[in-house]
């Protein structure tokens, strides 16, 4: 009890003290000064000592003046704090210039002062303030018609009177409503004055290769981020923008940075055209005919039907089964490398789900990057034009297997087993010496 009893006994004291004044009935202070107990509610206009000028009653009048001045000061401070908070909450975007805001804030402040003066009337004298306070203390039935102050015995007794009487809470909601109505009326012309100008448009300076994006001023903070992305990037599909926004966790600035960085990486390569159909698979199923046009090579060497176009293993399974390959080659082509490719086809499963549908943005970027690097490898090794024997060697190379073996290789590689796929690239009747030779040595011997 000694270790734990004293804190609980100490904390129990202040809790029991505020409960007692809440249960007492407010009494008239002037009558109490003269030895009479009278209930305060409805008593002000009938008090027999309301015109008394004794020392105790004069002291009560002075206390009422002090309390009325304090109440008026607190109301004014609350009004000023409310005026300073509401315009700051309307400033949502970070890049707004301050010059136009200050010009519109000055008439707004003067309007607030005018409205406050008209609501409160002329400045009151301390006697009027004390009368108003005493009218609030007297109760709802008094009506506040009499201007004579009512006596309160002490500040300790006046505080419970302020808390218990219902009239003290009545003027404050009216003032709050007038303040909110004033703030609404002041905030209404703000978008009207800012929208037709569009001069202080904020700029989001995004670090990236493509520069910055200027957001229009009409995009306020209450707009959903998806609508903002649709207005900034109208060429992108809404489903793509929604997925990018979900990947960023709803962060609008992060989604804009990702879209800008993806656009800046694809601009120098000229992989995707500016139209929206660049993300849709063409009707004939040839995905990589457009990116090959960015290379300044003659069409005779790099035509669609040549031996060095994009291999069929990078195409969809519907195309490989349909046999759409034009040109002199009737069998599907493979790379001339016996080793497994540097970039395995890990995206084939994700792309073959919707075989004729649109691509996702990141898949197309990574897909085209793989294709371009493989084309650079092919160009670096097969730059000299091939004559009849060289083309015949490549066409009759044992690396070019039949279509069932290609399907077997694709299915094995989808199961991420590159070792078996490497062995299936050779024919069954091939010698071990031919297998040990690398593709580079065979190509050099053939070209020489």
Curated annotation (Swiss-Prot):
It is found in: Nucleus. GO terms for molecular function: DNA-binding transcription factor activity, RNA polymerase II-specific; metal ion binding; RNA polymerase II cis-regulatory region sequence-specific DNA binding; sequence-specific DNA binding. Residues 98-203, 424-448 are annotated as: Disordered. CDD domains: CUE_DMA_DMRTA3. Gene3D superfamilies: DM DNA-binding domain. GO terms for cellular component: nucleus. The keyword Transmembrane does not apply. Probable transcription factor that plays a role in configuring the spinal circuits controlling motion in vertebrates. Involved in neuronal specification within specific subdivision of spinal cord neurons and in the development of a coordinated locomotor network controlling movements. May regulate transcription. This is Doublesex- and mab-3-related transcription factor 3a. It comes from Danio rerio. The gene is dmrt3a.
């Amino acid at each position: 009890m000694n270790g734990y009893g004293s804190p609980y006994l100490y904390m129990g004291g202040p809790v029991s003290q505020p409960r007692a004044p809440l249960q007492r009935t407010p009494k008239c202070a002037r009558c109490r000064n003269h030895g009479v107990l009278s209930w305060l509610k409805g008593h002000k206009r009938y008090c027999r000592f309301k015109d008394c000028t004794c020392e105790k009653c004069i002291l009560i009048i002075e206390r009422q003046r002090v309390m009325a001045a304090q109440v008026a000061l607190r109301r004014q401070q609350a009004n000023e704090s409310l005026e300073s908070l509401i315009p700051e909450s309307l400033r949502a975007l970070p890049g707004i210039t301050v010059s136009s805001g200050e010009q519109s804030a000055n008439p707004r402040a003067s309007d607030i002062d005018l409205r406050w003066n008209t609501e409160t009337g002329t400045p009151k004298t301390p006697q009027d303030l004390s009368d108003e306070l005493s009218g609030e203390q007297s109760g709802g039935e008094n009506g506040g018609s009499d201007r004579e102050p009512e006596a309160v015995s002490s500040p300790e007794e006046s505080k419970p009177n302020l808390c218990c009487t219902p009239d003290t809470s009545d003027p404050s909601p009216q003032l709050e409503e007038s303040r909110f109505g004033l703030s609404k009326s002041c905030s209404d012309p703000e978008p009207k004055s800012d929208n037709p100008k569009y001069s202080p448009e904020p700029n989001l300076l995004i670090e990236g290769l493509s520069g910055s994006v200027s957001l229009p001023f009409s995009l306020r903070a209450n707009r959903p981020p998806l609508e903002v992305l649709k207005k900034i990037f109208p060429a992108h599909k809404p489903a793509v923008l929604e997925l990018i926004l979900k990947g960023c966790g709803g962060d609008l600035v992060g989604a804009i940075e990702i879209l800008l960085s993806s656009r800046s990486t694809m601009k120098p390569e000229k992989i995707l055209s500016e139209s929206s159909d660049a993300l849709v698979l063409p009707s004939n199923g040839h995905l990589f005919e457009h990116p090959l046009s960015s290379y300044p090579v003659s069409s005779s060497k790099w035509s669609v039907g040549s031996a060095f176009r994009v291999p069929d293993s990078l195409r969809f399974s519907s195309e490989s089964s349909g046999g759409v390959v034009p040109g002199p080659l009737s069998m599907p082509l493979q790379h001339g490398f016996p080793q497994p490719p540097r970039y395995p086809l890990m995206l084939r499963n994700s792309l073959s789900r919707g075989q004729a549908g649109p691509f996702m943005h990141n898949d197309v970027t990574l897909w085209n990057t793989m294709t371009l690097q493989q084309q650079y490898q092919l160009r670096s090794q097969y730059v000299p034009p091939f004559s009849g024997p060289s083309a015949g060697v490549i066409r009759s190379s044992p690396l070019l297997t039949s279509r069932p073996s290609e399907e077997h290789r694709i299915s094995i590689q989808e199961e991420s087993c590159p070792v078996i796929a490497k062995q299936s690239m050779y024919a069954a009747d091939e010698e071990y010496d031919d297998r040990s030779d690398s593709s580079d040595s065979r190509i050099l011997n053939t070209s020489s």
